[in-house]
């Protein structure tokens, strides 16, 4: 194999992720790479929340079409943007080492969530973040915030918001660590499924590519991601519901913490389970939470 063409979105963060994968393929597999950038519907439609326009798949469809049309061999994604069910014919071939999975509190005026005054305006379009923030601080005003990292930071700097919530991983990768005012504890805001993990998507019939890319796979990331995604799949969660899940691996034991919440944050259910089989663990925890009324909470 002489070359691999990688499909990527055009944002700085997407290109950082793609170049990271490109460098690893070239250095570790000794295969030349070319990047094919493109805009997705998720990048173009910025005036509506994701849950109103079709969900996370809007960040992937154009990249998948490029693979089907032989204009790319693989695509690179942030795992938190990947739906629990891929279109037929596609698979996730490699999981990269996880960056800090926590949410980041970013503000020019306040040092932490606790420091925000009553009625402060916080920007996020994530139902998961909104629900958990309102559960912790019901007196805050949450307003939608879409766009790439730089666009969101500009809106904060222009005074549109008192604070915004972003993924720490994205800020760290873009060397914008100094913008992080507070790493939000997972006890306050449980991360999105797969947050902090970069993945490679490929056609499942591309056996030669899949075999080579397997060498890049981080087994720890694959393990925790499998648990989190199994939980999400059992609940059939997407960006239209407030669901969070975070798995930690210690001595071959996985501890999975998960939560579901009503969109207003008034009702929240959080549980934790430990086991050694990630797929089974995710399903068991989801089933336990369903029995405790998870679906009723998500419908509110």
UniProtKB/Swiss-Prot annotation:
Keyword Mitochondrion found: no
A GO CC term assigned to this protein in UniProt: cytoplasm
Catalyzed reaction equations: 4 porphobilinogen + H2O = hydroxymethylbilane + 4 NH4(+)
Matches recorded under InterPro entries: HemC, Porphobilin_deaminase_cofac_BS, Porphobilin_deaminase_N, Porphobilinogen_deaminase_C, Porphobilinogen_deaminase_C_sf
Chain positions with S-(dipyrrolylmethanemethyl)cysteine modification: 239
Pathway noted in the entry: Porphyrin-containing compound metabolism; protoporphyrin-IX biosynthesis; coproporphyrinogen-III from 5-aminolevulinate: step 2/4
Required cofactor(s): dipyrromethane
Enzyme's top EC category: transferase
A single GO molecular function term of this UniProt record: hydroxymethylbilane synthase activity
Cofactor note: Binds 1 dipyrromethane group covalently.
Keywords associated with the record: Porphyrin biosynthesis, Transferase
GO BP annotation list: protoporphyrinogen IX biosynthetic process
Signal peptide boundaries: none
Entry EC no(s): 2.5.1.61
Function of the molecule: Tetrapolymerization of the monopyrrole PBG into the hydroxymethylbilane pre-uroporphyrinogen in several discrete steps.
PANTHER family: PORPHOBILINOGEN DEAMINASE
Note, other: The porphobilinogen subunits are added to the dipyrromethane group.
Assembly with partners or alone: Monomer.
Classification via HAMAP family: Porphobil_deam
Family (UniProt): Belongs to the HMBS family.
UniProt-recorded name of the protein: Porphobilinogen deaminase
Source species of the chain: Francisella philomiragia subsp. philomiragia (strain ATCC 25017 / CCUG 19701 / FSC 153 / O#319-036)
Top-level taxonomy: Bacteria, Pseudomonadati, Pseudomonadota, Gammaproteobacteria, Thiotrichales
Name of the coding gene: hemC
